[in-house]
Amino acid sequence: MADSSSSLLPLCERISHKSYILRIVDLTILVLLFSLLWYRILHMCENNTIWLVAFLCESCFSFMWLIITCIKWSPAEDKPYPNRLDERVHDLPSVDMFVPTADPVREPPIIVVNTVLSLLAVNYPANKLACYVSDDGCSPLTYFSLKEASKFVKIWAPFCKKYNVRVRAPFRYFLNPLVATDDSVFSKDWKMMKREYVKLCRKVEDATGDSHWLDADDDFEAFSNTKPNDHSTIVKVVWENKGGVGDEKEVPHLVYISREKRPNYLHHYKTGAMNFLLRVSGLMTNAPYMLNVDCDMYANEPDVVRQAMCVFLQNSKNSNHCAFVQFPQNFYDSYTNELVVLQHYMKRGVAGIQGPIYIGSGCFHTRRVMYGLSSDDLEDDGSLSSVASREFLSEDSLVRKYGSSKELVKSVVDALQRKSNPQKSLANLVEAAQEVGHCHYEYQTSWGNLGWLYDSVAEDTNTSIGIHLRGWTSSFISPDPPAFLGSTPSVGPEAIVQHRRWATGSIEVLFNKQSPLIGFRRKIKFRQRLAYFWVLMCIRSIPELVYCLLPAYCLLNNSALFPKGPCLGIIVTLVGMHCLYTLWQFMILGFSVKSWYVSQSLWRIIATSSWLFSIQDIILKLLGISKIGFIVAKKNMPETRSGYESKSKPSQGEDDGLKLELGKFEFDSSCHFIPGTFIMLVNLAALAGFLVRLQRSSYSHGGGGGSALAETCGCAMIVMLFFPFLKGLFEHGKYGIPLSTLSKAAFLTVLFASYHL
């Protein structure tokens, strides 16, 4: 319960990051873009069809920059003060923590274990926490790993709290060598913890290699004769915090769940798993707040729960209307820092409007909001209005919305009315939890319209806009060090596939009932709508692909793409200012020029591969030809994570030894790499043809072709941006472009070079 005294310092503050200099730069770039468009309109009749194509592409780029400028206009974030929490709040609220996983091969159990261990050891009362792991793969190996982790955490959590360990994921903590003296108490405890963690890793790895011995354990009987897409509901209470004495009271609840899946029933991928987590946790612990993280996103800040509670427990109307608190998505092995820069500027910009967009991980939700409440359903003190009480609390409405489980309906009523749940034995609730996991439980209910929303493989964007449409706000906290850290897919096929899924899900939002294009009377601010349009920027992939080919086409056909004479300064100034601006954004955050270049290159590649094929996926779905599937991204764990002694000792830097070599790019024979290879070959052919003509002194300067210097520079810039493909022409193995991809791209290049508008 929070203290209402106004004399106490606030739990959190809204920090504004407005910068008039950045506004001027953004507006200047926008003016230059519009000037270029106006110049093309004035001279459209004097030039060929190429100018019309360029005009359409540049119109798309200008529209996107207009949206970006609007979003970044008033950046803000919330700054929490968790050290003030104990003074202001006498009884901290409970928090349920969700960790979904789906495939023990692509998401190794040891990764899940480290994430769970980091959550179970956070600085928060253990009796107020519960961790639920949803296993959509129904893997006995995942359950076994959690059982072993529950034994290890009984010594790990007290160790972390005793020595105030910051990084509480063991695989990261033990990367750094011991610096204490050998005879110190800490040194002895550290070595003991390292040995125990190595034992844990070995047990998990041994079970991974040969899991047949698990069949002899009666506790694994529920996993017999199961398949990932065909099995009954399994709910296992791995560890229950019953108070107790000593170290046992330091460990929160840990529950393993796997919902029923049958081949002929829709299960809605991760979204369905999140709704099952919502129902099971409501039955068992019914915490008013919930944290969800991806299975590889460990808690890097032990006070992260307390930081989020500072927002929710602040005595203000805004805190009552805050639906979720979003932390940035950061990575310890990132091949690009573009996401860090993006979140620093764009996420803060959105946070200054109605609040950040939910990004699927590192987010604290309010249970009442996920149960379907709108902001208008609450009084100023946070209680339900009389109208909302009649709508939500009638018996018919409860069954129609939430299903036939009496236990779940009772827990929903308690959650909506903010009633505290009496302590219950989790073991006694397993049967009720299994009932709400049946594959037919959601039929003829509102699940999918409340909770995590269906109709998109990007459940985060879809759910986020549904929340903001109901009038709720959200909060953005970006602490230093980052609250959560995760792993990125390898540079190449895995990253491309993941971005394709993200892009496909984002475009799906345009065509469902949560679309920002419709419902202008809903309770969402206009600039917040623009923020969701920015998320859908992947639709610019076609203009991006075309624009990468235009300079080469003009060189090959002796035609002009860019203005001539003094007006060429518009293009030069625009490109130069944009490059310097984005470079400054990287360097001001401490990143290198090389990091900026790699990020620019990678995002051009993603735009012409992942985003391009996501449009194809949407078209095929709309035509009813195919459905969009959910592809689990492979989580890679470096050898240094296993806990075994490493020959090379990393330094004290948190990320030492884990960064991928910049510029290394992996290829496979999938169609994703044909566009990039095609772009590279076309621009190389255009440059080669131009040099040959220049050498023969037969290149014509008339006919509207100009000196072709601008087009040549454009081709050279595109070659630089697609440099990984140039390297791939000469590499072998996974770093080389497969012959099948190269031959298809070469065939397209020949067709392109011989075509004339």
Curated annotation (Swiss-Prot):
Cellular component GO terms held in the UniProt record:
Golgi membrane; plasma membrane
Do the record's keywords include NAD? Answer: no
Q: What is its EC number?
A: 2.4.1.-
- Segments crossing the lipid bilayer: 24-44, 50-70, 530-550, 568-588, 612-632, 672-692, 706-726, 735-755
Tissue expression, as annotated, is: Expressed in young seedlings, primarily in the root vascular tissue.
Bilayer topology annotation = Multi-pass membrane protein
Q: Where in the cell is it found?
A: Golgi apparatus membrane
- GO BP terms in the entry: cell wall organization; cellulose biosynthetic process; plant-type primary cell wall biogenesis
Active-site annotation: D136, D460
Q: Which UniProt key words apply to this protein?
A: Cell wall biogenesis/degradation, Glycosyltransferase, Golgi apparatus, Membrane, Transferase, Transmembrane, Transmembrane helix
Q: What class of enzyme is it?
A: transferase
Which InterPro entries does the entry link to?
Cellulose_synth, Nucleotide-diphossugar_trans
The UniProt entry's sequence similarity note says: Belongs to the glycosyltransferase 2 family. Plant cellulose synthase-like B subfamily.
Q: What is this protein called?
A: Cellulose synthase-like protein B6
Question: Which species is the source of this protein?
Answer: Arabidopsis thaliana
Gene (name only): CSLB6
